[in-house]
């Protein structure tokens, strides 16, 4: 684990006179423009792991405050297959497997990925504008808009903050102070009725249909894009109006060659306002201090693991 990187550091501690303005511009475009950006060409193939982590942490100082990505308080996550999908449980987070990840958002204002190594085949990154998906459903199936804005139970995938239930309620469509914030996590809606049948009602036929219509609309080639990202590429996405996915992949045999990405969850201090009910998942709605999972400690108690982990076992 790396713990020396300071949570209280600022851009002045990591000056980037040429690259810094570009990082700020990308973040601004994500927050108030197209919602995503890609930076290409970081020399990760000649950097050590620690150098890559430090450089990526430095980027975060230009984008927002880091938030915990799991109950172990990881502030930089490792997206890597560490669980065989044939043995994975329903509560396993899919980023730890090679299985396809359906359309979803992460529990943060911004999410970033740094590609260290790519898969042997597959593993394409897909993005779609959830605002465009909403507009298309409003045009073709307006009857589903009240359904999407209704009550949806979501599973916490066994990462339950103290005093919370293993599920929570969060509408897909959220209007607040002039913003439409869209929260979409495809597979998280089906689990609570199965795992907690005495507490969570089953999905209604209208909800089942809304899920399928959303999936089909998001996957249309005129709405979504797919990219094959390379080692050294950095992507930054805004979760409130962009959904993303990943195709299934075949990995390399040798452990040193396996697909490996680093991930940041970020909360900018100038992020949009969110309705109070986001607090049940995000631990609050104050920009710069919201998002993530776990909430066992403040972000200043986070760690920077050098490698992917499952439980206490490093892989």
Pin down the residues of each PLM region.
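"Short basic amphipathic alpha-helical interaction patches in structured regions
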Residues: 50-57, 127-129
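Active-site environment of non-heme Fe oxygenases that use a 2-His-1-carboxylate facial triad
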Residues: 1-19, 24-25, 32, 37, ...
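A short alpha->loop->secondary-structure connector
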Residues: 56-66
């Amino acid at each position: 684990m790396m713990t020396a990187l300071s949570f209280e550091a600022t851009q002045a501690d990591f000056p980037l006179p040429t690259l810094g303005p570009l990082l700020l511009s990308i973040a601004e475009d994500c927050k108030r423009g197209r919602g995503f950006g890609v930076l290409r060409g970081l020399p990760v193939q000649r950097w050590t792991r620690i150098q890559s982590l430090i450089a990526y942490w430095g980027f975060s100082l230009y984008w927002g405050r880091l938030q915990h990505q799991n109950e172990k308080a990881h502030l930089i996550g490792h997206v890597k297959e560490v669980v065989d999908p044939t043995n994975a449980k329903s509560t396993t987070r899919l980023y730890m497997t090679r299985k396809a990840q359906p359309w979803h958002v992460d529990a943060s204002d911004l999410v970033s990925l740094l590609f260290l190594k790519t898969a042997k085949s597959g593993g394409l990154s897909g993005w779609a504008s959830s605002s465009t998906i909403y507009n298309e459903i409003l045009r073709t199936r307006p009857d589903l808009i009240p359904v999407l804005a209704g009550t949806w139970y979501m599973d916490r995938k066994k990462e339950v903050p103290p005093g919370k239930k293993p599920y929570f309620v969060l509408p897909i469509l959220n209007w607040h102070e002039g913003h439409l914030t869209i929260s979409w996590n495809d597979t998280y809606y089906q689990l609570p009725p199965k795992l907690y049948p005495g507490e969570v009602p089953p999905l209604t036929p209208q909800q089942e249909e809304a899920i399928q219509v959303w999936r089909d609309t998001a996957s249309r080639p005129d709405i979504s894009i797919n990219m094959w990202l390379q080692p050294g590429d950095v992507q930054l996405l805004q979760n409130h109006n962009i959904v993303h996915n990943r195709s299934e992949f075949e990995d390399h045999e040798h452990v040193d060659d396996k697909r490996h990405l680093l991930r940041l969850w970020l909360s900018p201090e100038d992020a949009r306002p969110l309705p109070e009910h986001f607090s049940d998942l995000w631990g609050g709605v104050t920009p710069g201090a919201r998002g993530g999972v776990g909430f066992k400690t403040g972000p200043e108690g986070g760690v920077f693991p050098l490698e992917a982990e499952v439980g206490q076992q490093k892989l």
